[in-house]
Amino acid sequence: MPLNLPDKLPAIELLKEENIFVIDNSRATQQDIRPLRIVILNLMPLKITTETDLVRLLSNTPLQVEISFMKIKSHTSKNTPIEHMKTFYTDFDKMREDRYDGMIITGAPVEQMDFEEVNYWDEITEIFDWARTHVTSTLYICWAAQAGLYHHYGIPKYALDKKMFGIFKHRTLLPLHPIFRGFDDEFYVPHSRHTEVRKEDILKVPELTLLSESDDSGVYMVVARGGREFFVTGHSEYSPLTLDTEYRRDVSKGLPIEIPRNYYVNDDPDKGPLVRWRGHANLLFSNWLNYFVYQETPYNIEDIR
């Protein structure tokens, strides 16, 4: 079914080129159904790229999905045109009375700072708390997963000796959990981070369930509150060339960076990536939308508590 996106969002034309069915608000109003309302708090620097990556994965849904973009007042994006932010993003203060069937909170390039040192920490933790009573299910990604686990459950993060960078093999610990419907026993996920959360800390908290891990990249997915909170440390949403872009950017800046592991054909940047995560990325997002948003949310959205 189609995605309902804000009129003239750049992702619309980009995704139409991939034969993904999206409609704008003008056409969606002609369909007499209640769409699933999904809000995305996009903390990534390249917001248009992240918008496109997430919208692509939200395209396989059981119902029309209405996408809104949230921003925080205490931080100004330096890598996205101001006009784009004004047109497509809304301050949290103006959305706090609204309710949503689902929410996605992205990663952010602040993981090497202590949580409390992040200039928008107070505002984002207010959003974390707000989501618990205004959203049916929230998906925290990468830094947001670490931040959410720390804020809600006191789980610390730890600095890595070197960047976790590449495509890593994962396994499911509860293969019958609905979030893994259709998954293979092993699957691949991109990671790009300097910090980690650890299994032993997760297992100490009875409210948390570890769902998936990797021998190389550690904790991948944690669930809480019966599926109302998912914490995902990797970047399943990444497009095929995202790690390549990050690698070449750091090389051009003279930064210490290794070739992303298990990513390029024969580990040769000139041969391009071998994409092994796309199928499971689509399953992850469609399962989340189906089993934890669509099937759990009340018909009257005001009944979300």
Curated annotation (Swiss-Prot):
The answer on whether this UniProt entry bears the keyword RNA-binding reads no
**Keyword Cytoplasm applies:** yes
> Which keywords belong to this entry?
Acyltransferase, Amino-acid biosynthesis, Cytoplasm, Methionine biosynthesis, Transferase
Broad class of enzyme this protein falls into: transferase
Q: Name one GO cellular component term.
A: cytoplasm
A Pfam family of this chain: HTS
**UniProt site positions, description: Important for substrate specificity:** S192
Catalytic site positions: C142 (acyl-thioester intermediate), H235 (proton acceptor), E237
Q: Which HAMAP family match?
A: MetA_acyltransf (MF_00295)
Under PANTHER family, the record lists: HOMOSERINE O-SUCCINYLTRANSFERASE
Could you tell me what this protein is called? Homoserine O-acetyltransferase
Gene name per UniProt: metAA
